[in-house]
């Protein structure tokens, strides 16, 4: 899972896609599987380009972190990326056959309101998106 932040503008790149287990559209950060022979950084760069069309550079990558250790062995790497909007020339996406993804550029200070609107629309919001908003000072009042 990556946290792509733009420059200029300090906006988050967020996607919305249908997630069958939830039965609804879900807002989330771009993410994807690591292919055989790939490391987490390479996978993050590839997935961001495939899902959003944006190219980014990796600022940091965590080791494995477990998403729900009480229920499963699933893990992710959290990858923070910078996307230079002025350097983007080819925003073509390359979705998997089952994917239909919309991309949103959201100012970080507007994220709590963005999440509230998403929920009012009946959409789901991924935990990691909420956590980013909380750690940036949202939802604390």
Locate each region found by the language model.
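N-terminal strand-loop-strand
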Residues: 1-29
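Short alpha-helical scaffold segments that flank and stabilize functional sites
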Residues: 7, 46-47, 136
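Residue-level signal for alpha-helical context at structural boundaries
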Residues: 28, 62, 129-133
């Amino acid at each position: 899972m990556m946290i792509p932040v733009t420059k200029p503008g300090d906006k988050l790149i967020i996607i919305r896609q249908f997630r069958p287990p939830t039965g609804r559209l879900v807002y989330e950060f771009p993410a994807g599987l690591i292919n055989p022979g790939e490391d987490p950084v390479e996978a993050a760069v590839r997935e961001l380009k495939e899902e959003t069309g944006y190219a980014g550079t990796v600022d940091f990558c965590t080791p494995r972190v477990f998403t729900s250790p009480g229920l499963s062995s699933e893990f992710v790497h959290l990858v923070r990326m910078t996307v230079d909007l002025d350097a983007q020339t080819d925003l073509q996406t390359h979705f998997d056959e089952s994917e239909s993804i919309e991309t949103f550029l959201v100012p970080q200070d507007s994220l709590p309101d963005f999440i509230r609107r998403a929920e009012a629309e009946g959409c789901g919001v991924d935990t990691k998106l909420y956590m980013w908003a909380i750690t940036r000072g949202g939802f604390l009042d």
